[in-house]
């Protein structure tokens, strides 16, 4: 019995199945393992002596009652696994709680504008949706704050849209014609719209503005170019191979040494004898007789016609034109030629004194910088092919008659004194004005571009005033005019490049 008792203490226990295959109370239906073997019985012999006899008793080791000191430790039992507890997810309370209780329990993510309204909440990284009543305070707050954004009222981010916004305001303000306004797309070749805006501005704000050797059309044309440059600078539009103003800042250095002039190459111009013959009835012939009575005379040419012959011993030309005849230029020439070197230097001094009078803070180096137009109306279009003749505007010094007779002491305006002390102005004309009256069939293009250096500077000032008058709350953008640097593309061209004529109806030129 003792052996059976020991075996009962070490009886087999149920094995807990693996996770996911059941619990201890419901083991899976599989064959149970065999019980471990019973320990071997060890017999001991004990001698029992009584008063009359001696008896040997066989006592089993398992049946001995050990002493308290010799009691073996209880067998170690395997640790019991704690049963898994099933988590019951509480159902969402759909009762109508107060607004404070909702904010305390969950974080409100949004309130949709659907019908019926939906309350979107987020908690522990999860989103839940709840249908709200129309009278709920959250619904009223969402209807007031969550308005649908109109796409047409989004902030302007495109450069083209910024430029079109400015131009639409200008065209509306100065009442530009409807056909120009409807076809305007902020393209580089649409300079006529800018010129029209400046023309209307001059007629309204500065009617009767005094000009010297400058046509009204050229003044508004240059103002339109500057306005286009301001619009492009404001909208951050940049062109790779085209400059909207068509101008450059030229450090001429023609006033440093008396009697020394420089051409566009930056080299010193050479002195050359020059003889001019003009028709007696022409405007140039009459002007030569009035301005230079000591050097101009009326004679007969080799064909027997009466002409005004003007001899210039102080003519200046480019170094590359030293071996060329009168009005002839080499292929390396810059096209700069002055019939009177002293008058040309006087014109440069006049502009320098004129700018110092308007801007007293200028230093000597800044006063020698001259704003010059490089392109006239003939070659200002983007992608224009070089034509025959001069590639830059022609510079001609014009003398101001009767300016020397004015009393210097009676004039207080410093800008006027600059012209009195230096009675000559540098005038910029078409690149090739000689083609205007030419009867040759292969004559190049020409235009009536004509503006003096002081009026060109005045065109820039008027354009700035137009911007500030039209947009008082908008900062005047910074207009970037490049510094002049001599390039091979400015060379005089004696031969025009061949140009093709589009013929879209044929794929083969020899398809007769």
From Swiss-Prot:
Subcellular location field: Host nucleus
Feature: compositional bias, Basic residues: 79-88
Modified residues annotated as Phosphotyrosine in this record: 174
One GO molecular-function entry: zinc ion binding
Keywords: DNA replication, DNA-binding, Early protein, Host nucleus, Host-virus interaction, Metal-binding, Phosphoprotein, Viral DNA replication, Zinc
Region spans: Disordered: 1-105
Main location: host cell
Keyword set includes DNA-binding: yes
Keyword field contains DNA-binding: yes
Tree of life domain: Viruses
Task of the protein: Plays a role in the elongation phase of viral strand displacement replication by unwinding the template in an ATP-independent fashion, employing its capacity to form multimers. Also enhances the rate of initiation. Released from template upon second strand synthesis. Assembles in complex with viral pTP, viral pol, host NFIA and host POU2F1/OCT1 on viral origin of replication. Covers the whole ssDNA genome during synthesis. The complementary strand synthesis induces its relese from DNA template. May inhibit cellular transcription mediated by the interaction between host SRCAP and CBP.
Subunit structure, interactors included: Homomultimerizes on viral ssDNA bound to pTP. Forms a initiation complex with viral polymerase, pTP and hosts NFIA and POU2F1/OCT1. Interacts with host SRCAP.
Family: Belongs to the adenoviridae E2A DNA-binding protein family.
Domain comment quoted from the record: The C-terminal arm bridges DBP molecules together, thereby creating a chain.
Protein name listed in UniProt: DNA-binding protein
Organism of origin: Human adenovirus E serotype 4 (HAdV-4)
Name of the coding gene: DBP
